[in-house]
């Protein structure tokens, strides 16, 4: 109702632009979505009404890559277990657990898909001394090798990876 006379709108999470909303827009020309996906917009209804739907394909690449590496480190260093031990006052019992944790240096990170996020993850993992392998049938071997990433088959990736990250 409030956007009925607007020329366009920028939307993001939680605001659904469905066929009913689109039908009530009189002079709307564009819906800009502040995310990679446009699943919160009924694109077919918008197209039929002559409304252009755009997205933001490069948003959050760096943030998702940071978060991915944070989760990898949390798993590798058993952060959840160590935090629970510290919370119980058993922090001093953590040394044997730490002795069982392998270094990331020399470990293999397998990436399924090698788009923008996976490329950013690979760049972050390299300084930790990780060997990076990737499988993506839609990306050239040249692009992967230019990033210092070894292209492999999916079966080989699953067999060789110590850690696995998927970024479709």
Predicted regions located by residue number:
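Short gly/ser/thr-rich secondary-structure transition/capping motifs
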Residues: 1, 11-14, 88-96, 145-151
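An N-terminal-biased, well-structured beta-alpha scaffold segment characteristic
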Residues: 1-54
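Phosphate-binding beta-alpha-beta segment of Rossmann-like dinucleotide-binding domains, i.e.
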Residues: 49, 57-108, 120-123
């Amino acid at each position: 109702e409030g956007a009925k006379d607007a020329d366009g709108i920028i939307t993001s999470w939680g605001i659904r632009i469905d066929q009913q909303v689109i039908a009530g827009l009189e002079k709307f020309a564009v819906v800009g979505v502040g995310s990679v996906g446009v699943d919160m917009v009924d694109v077919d209804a918008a197209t039929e009404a002559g409304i252009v739907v755009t997205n933001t394909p490069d948003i959050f690449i760096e943030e998702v890559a940071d978060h991915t590496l944070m989760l990898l480190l949390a798993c590798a260093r058993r952060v959840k277990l160590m935090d629970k031990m510290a919370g119980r006052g058993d922090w001093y019992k953590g040394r044997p657990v730490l002795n069982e944790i392998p270094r990331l240096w020399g470990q293999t990170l397998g990436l399924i898909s090698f788009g923008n996020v996976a490329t950013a993850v690979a760049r972050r993992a390299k300084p930790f001394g990780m060997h990076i392998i990737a499988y993506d049938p839609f990306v050239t071997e040249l692009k992967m090798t230019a990033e210092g990433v070894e292209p492999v088959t999916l079966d080989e990736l699953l067999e060789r990876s110590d850690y696995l990250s998927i970024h479709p």
